[in-house]
């Protein structure tokens, strides 16, 4: 997973103004949908959906967890299309999810949030870069209206 994260960080540097070459890698924790849901709702367990899974969650970045931040993500086998790959981590949809969280890692590690009105402002770049990554690979984007959602999720 470290090699994949390093390659995706290099892609981020090549396609944005984020300089990632000297950044430490975050810890990457692969999880089941149930475990990721519990991680997300750890401060408010009464809000966990009754079936134990929030289907909207793919991954989370926690800047203050671990020595250099932690990405909690669905294990590759849980991502749509995983069965089409000998190694589910080769699935471009999994890689885009990881790339999205690595954008947040780069934002936090380079101090960008200091100038933001709220943490949500980092979503626009993460969504746009994820869409660009999929487009480069000629993969159908699973998020219809990505630009709309990038805008909505970045509002404070």
Protein language model regions, located:
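A metal-dependent hydrolase signature that marks the N-terminal structural subdomain at the beginning
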Residues: 1-56
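Soluble non-cytosolic domains of exported or imported proteins
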Residues: 2-3, 88-97, 116-124
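Active-site scaffold of zinc-dependent metalloenzymes
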Residues: 41-92
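Structural recognition of the beta-strand scaffold that forms the well-ordered cores
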Residues: 72-73, 105-107, 128
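Active-site recognition of the HExxH zinc-binding catalytic motif
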Residues: 96-109
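Short, contiguous alpha-helical
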Residues: 113
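Post-HExxH zinc-binding segment in Zn-dependent metallohydrolases
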Residues: 117-152
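Short, solvent-exposed mixed-charge patches
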Residues: 155-156
């Amino acid at each position: 997973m470290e090699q994949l994260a390093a390659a995706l960080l290099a892609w981020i540097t090549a396609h944005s103004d984020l300089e990632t070459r000297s950044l430490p890698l975050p810890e990457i924790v692969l999880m089941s949908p149930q475990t990721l849901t519990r991680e997300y709702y750890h401060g408010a367990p009464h809000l966990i959906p009754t079936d134990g899974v929030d289907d909207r969650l793919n991954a989370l970045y926690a800047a203050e967890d671990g020595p250099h931040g932690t990405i909690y993500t669905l294990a590759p086998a849980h991502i749509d299309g995983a069965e089409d790959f000998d190694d589910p981590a080769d699935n471009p949809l999994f890689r885009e999810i990881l790339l999205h969280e690595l954008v947040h890692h780069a934002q936090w590690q380079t101090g960008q949030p200091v100038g933001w009105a709220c943490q949500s402002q980092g979503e626009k770049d993460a969504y746009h870069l994820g869409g660009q990554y999929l487009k480069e690979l000629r993969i159908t984007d699973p998020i219809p209206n990505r630009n709309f959602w990038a805008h909505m999720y970045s509002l404070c």
